[in-house]
Swiss-Prot record:
Similarity field: Belongs to the DNA mismatch repair MutS family.
PANTHER family in alphabetical order: DNA MISMATCH REPAIR PROTEIN MSH1, MITOCHONDRIAL (PTHR11361:SF34), DNA MISMATCH REPAIR PROTEIN MUTS FAMILY MEMBER (PTHR11361)
HAMAP family recorded: MutS
CDD domains associated with the record: ABC_MutS1
NCBIfam families (alphabetical): mutS1, PRK05399.1
Alphabetical UniProt keywords: ATP-binding, DNA damage, DNA repair, DNA-binding, Nucleotide-binding
Function, as annotated: This protein is involved in the repair of mismatches in DNA. It is possible that it carries out the mismatch recognition step. This protein has a weak ATPase activity.
Protein name from the UniProt record: DNA mismatch repair protein MutS
A GO CC term assigned to this protein in UniProt: cytosol
Residues the record lists as binding ATP: G613, P614, N615, M616, G617, G618, K619, S620
Length: 864
């Protein structure tokens, strides 16, 4: 906004200067009890927040559009703007109005952005809130993520933009920073909170210097990240952005970690979506894996569990330690005593971040005090059980002196804000107690003065009051105002009363106001000093919060295992998945009837199962439960099965269901083929691959050919551990032609025209698809079902003839080259016979006995 500031009022000139420094974001400009917005900001905020758009006088000869929000309710408005992906610069008055000449000095004290907020009211409690920078150089893609609410700082390098897209989908970022010349901007479509940043923010030397200054180091070698140069460029950008928005030191960001894909079982975007890990296909959180597993008692534990679910690990030693702890907590019956203690710890992780940023509120400190008070009892209940658990407890530490400090310093239930006063406890500071005593004595003094003045003047309506504008006053009703003594100085005239001041009251007012002001100022100083006293042990408290989060997750998983009858899985270094009595962890919780448990057996000699069976028979549920059980094992959880042995896995792929991608202009079939191509390129012999109904979106010949070729590729080329569900019965001949392939089917029983789904997995191929029976269940008209039966009988006859003619082992009608001419099929709506016409013409209520007898003979004749 280029303006000639000389044409504007001094206040608007000040506003425009501040706005020029923050051109792309909303500016909340503090004026008294309101944050005001002007010009285009006002129009935008009025639309987004549904607040009134008004005008404020004129500046440079033009009316000024204006909108505002009360300062005491600003958090709610900020929360809405942040949820919409907007950023806001908060501009406060920092000068003293009493001494200012011209506009009070103001400056932007912080910038609230979706990815860097730390205020409790602006954050999703049980979900990570991340800002990330992405960068590409010479074909290498990188992402650096920062959690401002915990200080967690991670970098990753990725081989291609598809891997980056999958990572973005996993992280569900609140804000994404990218360079102006980023080469793959198309993958950012449909994301909000996008911020284009200048290229210089991604320069390597600048990034390394910035990171070293932040961590107080000379080199990044100690973090093991020095060779990840592309990722360091991204890290420099995101750290610069954090410093720019927070306008304060960031002591809780004290390390950086390089995440390697080789450390995790990789899940692509389609797999996360299809398995409904933390979000269901409708976009909600109900009936997801997280909804079943997450009964954590702390928000920070809940967030950690979701990270585990989205990023299962391959470190078997670490997994076995998690299993040991879960096992021990169950056997030693420590779940029940630990969970209430952990619940009282609350969100210690985010409270510590606000302490580091010096934005913690009084109630944050009381919650921290409560959290620290739980630590001795938590340690007592968790230690001396296993070496793994002892190592975790050792991180919790002893903070008894900090707990004692907060106990002395903060009252039991403080007000929400320090500016309201009354936060620091009595006895903590002698000077503060003196000022408070002076201020508190005002009530008694004023009562005595009021009684004395009434008696001296004889005015029974006289009373002493106070307001923020005029201070203390003596009020007399209009009917008795003529009795006011000469030394009473009129201060204000009201409709029914006069207000006066006397020298004694004015002197006392100055003294009391000074005491209140001094009390509030000293209290704010003491409160700020508390941060200084907490800061030396911030790093240790962060480690404790991490350990408590993990203990919460493991205690939660122990409770889930106990409540839901889960078993401890075992791991094998060999390829394979061997599950007995496996159950779908989500479906079994929502079914009213008992869930039918099923086995699966895959290994190097039996690595592809062709899964057949009717629609609604449970094929998709069966395949998903195998993936979910495997994933649960790789986060360290117990699993819903009678027993489970899981071999080495590097990736889990799913190709289940599809719909049009309208935003990208891709059809259902194109989406399906894109996902399939990704699997065929990326899958290895250690990948678990689930394919459901590939090839449905095109012609029958094309679909069957593609399904056959994909199955053959997976069986022969990649030899991945694969479940391949299909309605193409031609594929059931694959086991006779390829090594390592077997048939299984979901059982069903047909009785007359109805079908009963048994939901049990049996060896061998299904005998038929039961498609017509399922169609009848869905309410398809009976005449349509009858016509379909006729068509089916004809096609099956042709298929049989083709097999006999060509001795074709696959010999299905779909590969027959000589389909005969289709015979005449009965029309959908048949013509009425003479008998039916005669019967329809009879009205029984109108017939005499003789006419009825004649009609009966006529109908009998027509039948003959």
């Amino acid at each position: 906004m280029t303006q000639d500031l000389s044409k504007h009022t001094p206040m608007m000139a000040q506003y425009l200067q501040l706005k020029a420094q923050n051109p792309d974001i909303l500016l909340f400009y503090r004026m008294g009890d309101f944050y005001e917005l002007f010009y285009d900001d006002a129009k935008k905020a009025a639309a987004l927040l549904d607040i009134s758009l008004t005008k404020r006088g004129a500046s440079a000869g033009e009316p000024i559009p204006m909108a505002g929000v009360p300062y005491h309710a600003v958090e709610g408005y900020l929360a809405k703007l942040v949820s919409l992906g907007e950023s806001v610069a908060i501009c406060e008055q920092i000068g003293d109005p009493a001494t200012s000449k011209g506009p009070v000095e103001r400056k932007v004290v912080r910038i609230v952005t979706p990815g860097t907020v730390s205020d409790e009211a602006l954050l999703p409690e049980r979900q990570d809130n991340l800002v990330a920078a992405i960068y590409e150089e010479k074909g290498v893609f990188a992402i650096a993520t920062l959690d401002m609410t915990s200080g967690r700082f991670l970098i990753t390098e990725l081989p291609n933009k598809e891997a980056l897209a999958a990572e973005l989908q996993r992280l569900q970022l609140a804000e994404i920073l990218y360079a102006e010349d980023f080469s793959a901007a198309e993958i950012l479509n449909n994301y909000k909170g996008l911020r284009r940043r200048p290229v210089w923010e991604f320069e390597l030397v600048t990034a390394i210097n910035l990171l070293n200054r932040q961590f107080g180091t000379q080199s990044l070698a100690g973090f093991g990240v020095e060779k990840a140069v592309v990722a360091l460029c991204a890290a420099g950008c995101v750290l610069h952005y954090a410093q720019e928005t927070q306008r304060t030191a960031l002591p809780h960001i004290n390390s950086i970690h390089l995440a390697q894909n080789s450390d995790t079982v990789l899940l692509d975007a389609a797999t996360r979506r299809n398995l409904e890990l933390t979000q269901n296909l409708a976009g909600g959180t109900e009936n997801t894996l997280a909804a079943v597993l997450d009964k954590c008692v702390t928000p920070m534990g809940s967030r950690l569990l979701k990270r585990w679910i989205h990023q299962p690990i391959r470190d078997l030693e670490k997994l076995k330690k998690r299993q040991d702890i879960i096992d021990t907590l169950q056997k030693e019956q420590r779940i029940e005593p630990l969970q209430p203690l952990l619940q009282n710890v609350g969100d210690m992780e985010r409270i510590l971040a606000r302490v580091a940023l010096r934005s913690a509120r009084p109630r944050d400190l009381t919650r921290l005090r409560t959290a620290l008070a739980q630590l001795p009892d938590i340690a007592k209940n968790a230690k001396n059980l296993t070496a793994s658990l002892d190592a975790l407890v050792a991180q919790i530490g002893d903070f008894s002196e900090l707990h004692a400090l907060l106990e002395r310093a903060i009252i039991e239930t403080p007000p929400q804000l320090i500016r309201d006063g009354g936060v620091i406890a009595e006895g903590y500071n002698a000077e503060l107690d003196e000022w408070r005593e002076l201020s508190a004595g005002a009530t008694q003094y004023l009562e005595n003065l009021e009684i004395r003045e009434r008696e001296a003047t004889g005015i029974d309506t006289l009373k002493i009051g106070f307001n923020a504008v005029h201070g203390y006053y003596i009020q007399i009703s209009q009917g008795q105002a003529h009795k006011a003594p000469m030394h009473y100085v009129r201060r204000q005239t009201l409709k029914n009363a006069e207000r006066y001041i006397i020298p004694e009251l004015k002197t006392y007012e100055d003294k009391v106001l000074k005491a209140k002001g001094a009390s509030l100022a000293l209290e704010k100083q003491l409160y700020d000093e508390l941060f200084d006293l907490l800061m030396p042990r911030l790093g240790e408290m962060q480690l404790a919060a991490m350990a408590l989060s993990e203990l919460d997750v493991l205690t939660n998983l122990a409770e889930r295992a106990e409540s839901l009858n889960y078993v401890r899985p075992t791991f094998s270094l060999q390829r394979g998945v061997n599950i007995k009595g496996g159950r779908h962890p989500v479906v079994e919780q929502v079914l009213k009837d008992p869930f039918i448990a099923n086995p699966v057996f895959l290994n190097a000699q039996r690595h592809l199962l062709v899964v057949t069976g009717p629609n609604m028979g449970g094929k998709s549920t069966y395949m998903r439960q195998i993936a979910l059980i495997s994933l649960m094992a790789y986060i360290g959880s117990f699993v819903p099965a009678d027993s489970a042995e899981i071999g080495a896995l590097d990736r889990i792929f799913t190709r289940i269901g599809a719909s049009d991608d309208l935003a990208s202009g891709r059809s259902t079939f194109m989406v399906e083929m894109t996902e399939m191509a990704n699997i065929l390129h990326q899958a290895t012999e250690n990948s678990l691959v689930l394919i459901d109904e590939i090839g449905r979106g095109t012609s029958t010949y094309d679909g069957l050919s593609l399904a056959w070729a994909c199955a053959e590729w997976l069986a022969k080329k990649t030899q991945s551990l694969t479940l391949f569900a299909t309605h193409y019965f031609e594929l059931t001949s694959l086991p006779s032609q390829l090594k390592g392939v077997a048939n299984v089917h979901l059982d069903a029983r047909e009785h007359q025209d109805s079908i009963v789904f048994m939901h049990s997995v049996q060896e061998g191929a299904a005998s038929k698809s039961y498609g017509l029976a399922v169609a009848a269940l869905a309410g398809v008209p009976k005449q349509v079902i009858q016509l379909a039966k006729q068509r089916l009988a004809h096609l099956e006859e042709i298929s049989l003839q083709t097999k006999e003619a060509h001795d074709n082992p696959q010999g299905d009608l779909l590969f027959a080259a000589d389909l005969q001419e289709t015979p005449q099929i009965q029309p959908l709506v048949a013509q009425q016979s003479e008998l039916e016409k005669a019967l329809m013409s009879i009205d029984p209520d109108e017939l005499t006995p003789r006419q009825a007898l004649e009609a009966l003979y006529r109908l009998k004749k027509l039948m003959a």
